């Protein structure tokens, strides 16, 4: 039965295990929500605004089905965009987006219709009547979201995180320090960015010393607002020892308007990652490394819509073990590190790294892997090579508030099914299985990130 009680639960033990975790609070240490939207607490106007306006998963699949861009990110009305989505939605079967959006519709709106061209108008009207009462803060409470960490640039004022702390009682909203722009020295806007953070923190960032001082001040500012983790996007980690003298020369070269060669770019990024590690060591933050996403691969999307518009891909040819070796040894036992890999063929590398370094944790199946298939494969491999008990937990990685419930439910069901299979095969006693799924879903990630 579609989305029935046994959805994704493939054995009797899984049903028992899911009953232990389905109502646990949600702790999400990595997502892309905007704290401003939560604080202002404005309701959505329509179902497209809820499900399609910010979701590049939806955009990509609509493009795959031949929907013109004007019905995705263009000038068409939200109603026209929803109707265009509904028309092609049956083609999404097998992709987790098909299940997520139906779960949103069935669980949050109690509108138990299958999305199609025929039902699109009814769904539009039914949800539109309900949306005035479905504010962001109410939804977060209804979905039992206890803690969420947004992703924020070091130049952020964190004004809305402060307001959230003062005014919102049911959910804790914390920032995450994401200093990618600070280390992307090859980007054309890097120098302007460096000047801006200098203006904010009253430092002469044309010097390396001033730039590092400004970053330390930003780090402290985030700490004062409850930050517990940093987040870093690394296409391919290449972290090696680089002295401050070398980094200073590179920094000054950019400010003189000179172009860097590839080795200088790698050296500067490596130097900065080590500095970020030292900052996190000082504050006890978790360091999250997202590895293997090749950003903005489709040039036309980047030019017309900008980044984060559905043009990113996964790439395989990475030297993760070699690229992380210096960083992992430099911070051995000093820093909690979570590794997320986009290509599942790299899972053996990070799983064995985690076995070698007790301070390293394996992150959740991420981005293109957060489907039932991807999660099952990930969980089974981690359980067999490392410790499933030590998994860093579930992250939504979402730009869409409504998907917190659906993505978390899918993960908990798949986890229950995987562990339930072990019970059915006689590998685990049911009592230990119950403790395991509860730990992975809630106790473990809460302890790792929030102490």
Swiss-Prot record:
Pfam families: UxaC
GO molecular function: glucuronate isomerase activity
Catalytic activity field: D-glucuronate = D-fructuronate; aldehydo-D-galacturonate = keto-D-tagaturonate
Keyword field contains Protease: no
InterPro entries found in the cross-reference section: Metal_Hydrolase, Uronate_isomerase
Assigned EC number: 5.3.1.12
GO biological process: D-galacturonate catabolic process; D-glucuronate catabolic process
UniProt keywords, alphabetically: Isomerase
Gene3D superfamilies: Metal-dependent hydrolases, uronate isomerase, domain 2, chain A
Record bears the keyword Isomerase: yes
Recorded metabolic or biological pathway in which this protein acts: Carbohydrate metabolism; pentose and glucuronate interconversion
Similarity comment: family membership: Belongs to the metallo-dependent hydrolases superfamily. Uronate isomerase family.
Protein's name according to its UniProt entry: Uronate isomerase
Organism: Thermotoga neapolitana (strain ATCC 49049 / DSM 4359 / NBRC 107923 / NS-E)
Organism classification: Bacteria, Thermotogati, Thermotogota, Thermotogae, Thermotogales
């Amino acid at each position: 039965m579609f989305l029935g009680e046994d959805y994704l639960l493939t054995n009797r033990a899984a049903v028992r295990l899911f009953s232990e975790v389905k109502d646990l609070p949600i702790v999400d240490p990595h997502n892309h929500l905007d704290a401003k939207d939560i604080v202002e607490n404005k309701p959505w106007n329509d179902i497209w605004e809820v499900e399609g306006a910010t979701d590049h998963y939806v955009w990509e699949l609509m493009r795959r089905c031949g929907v013109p861009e004007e019905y995705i990110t263009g000038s068409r009305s939200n109603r026209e965009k929803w109707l265009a989505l509904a028309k092609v939605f049956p083609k999404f079967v097998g992709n987790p987006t098909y299940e997520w959006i139906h779960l949103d519709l069935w669980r949050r709106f109690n509108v138990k219709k299958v999305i199609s061209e025929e039902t699109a108008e009814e769904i539009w009207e039914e949800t539109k009547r309900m949306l005035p009462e479905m504010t962001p803060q109410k939804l977060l409470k209804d979905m039992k979201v206890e803690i969420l960490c947004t992703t924020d640039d070091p130049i952020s004022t964190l004004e809305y995180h402060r307001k959230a702390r003062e005014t919102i009682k049911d959910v804790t909203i914390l920032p995450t320090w994401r200093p990618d722009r600070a280390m992307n020295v090859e980007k054309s806007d890097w120098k302007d960015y460096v000047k801006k953070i200098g203006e904010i923190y009253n430092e002469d960032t044309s010097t390396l010393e001033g730039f590092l001082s400004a970053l330390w001040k930003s780090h402290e500012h985030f700490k004062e607002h409850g930050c517990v983790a940093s987040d870093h996007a690394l296409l391919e980690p290449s972290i090696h020892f680089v002295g401050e003298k070398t980094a200073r020369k590179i920094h000054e070269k950019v400010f003189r308007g000179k172009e860097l060669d590839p080795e200088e770019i790698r050296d500067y990024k490596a130097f900065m990652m080590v500095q970020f590690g030292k900052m996190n060591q000082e504050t006890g933050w978790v360091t999250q490394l997202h590895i293997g996403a090749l950003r903005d691969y489709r040039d036309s999307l980047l030019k017309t819509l900008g980044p984060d518009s559905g043009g990113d891909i996964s790439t395989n040819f990475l030297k993760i073990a070699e690229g992380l070796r210096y960083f992992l040894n430099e911070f051995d036992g000093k820093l909690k590190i979570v590794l997320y890999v986009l290509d599942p063929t790299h899972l053996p590398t990070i799983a064995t790294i985690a076995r070698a370094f007790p301070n390293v944790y394996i992150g959740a199946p991420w981005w293109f892997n957060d489907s039932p298939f991807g999660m099952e494969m990930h969980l089974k491999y981690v359980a067999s090579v490392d410790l499933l008990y030590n998994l860093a937990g579930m992250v939504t990685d979402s730009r869409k508030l409504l998907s917190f419930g659906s993505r978390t439910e899918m993960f908990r069901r798949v986890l229950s099914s995987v562990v339930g299979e072990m019970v059915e095969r006689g590998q685990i006693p049911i009592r230990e299985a119950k403790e395991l799924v509860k730990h992975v879903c809630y106790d473990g990630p809460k302890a790792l990130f929030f102490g």
